[in-house]
Amino acid sequence: YYFQKDFGYEINAIIDIPNKPKKFFQKQKLLKLKNSWYFHDHIKKTGQKPDLEYLNNFERKYQINLQQLTINERIFYRFNDFYKFSSDEVLSILEQECKLFETIVDEIKPNYFITPLTAFHHQHLFYEICRKRNIKTLMIYMSKFGHRCVISQDVNKLDFNPKLSHFQSKNRNFNQLLDYFKSFDIVKQIDDYKKKIENSKFKKLQAANNFFLNNDYSNQTHYTYYGRNRSKVLSHEIKKSIQLRKRRTFIKKNLSRIIPEKQK
């Protein structure tokens, strides 16, 4: 809503989505964008050797450990059950991402970068580039209180150091404070959301219908979807569902769920 208002700034966006929602973003009138980049349109399966000299120079220029980013990317390594990336593929993807992000920052010279909590290496890479180039970053993430978010430059770290003396006391006792905390229970918020989604047969059928009946070529154009097809995804979901049931059964049979009151 507030981004629709004209405050004298220009809005640019890097859009990281599969192929299906792309038409919506191309036609949307909710937000006026001066420039937009569809991230996966710029990352290709080239088959060419990566430019190691460029990557080394990039690391020195920005003081960013690219190896650390890729090693911690679940898509590239053992947590990906659908596709095994070669070292050259990983480095080629990284090279294209670095060049794309440098081009974008050089072109628009942003004053601010607004992002959700970075979940993939390429998101965190752009975040680090902005930080190194003194671009103000605003990261939005869930707080320890349910139904509340925090905006700061670093995750789980406020941009200021509030002092207790700056807050007016409401003279609540411990139990009242505990009740207040429980009223914003983040665990309950997540559980309620999961139950709403998991218990909705209509949404499950709708998702299955979209997956099996509509064509989506993201597995050919998006490296995050490489190796996926309908039969593999179905087989994978069945396998994971069986594993989940087995583990739940094991936990219920073998682990205590009640902590003795006097146990230290």
Which residues does each predicted region cover?
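Conserved nucleotide-sugar donor-interacting segment of glycosyltransferase catalytic cores
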Residues: 99-162
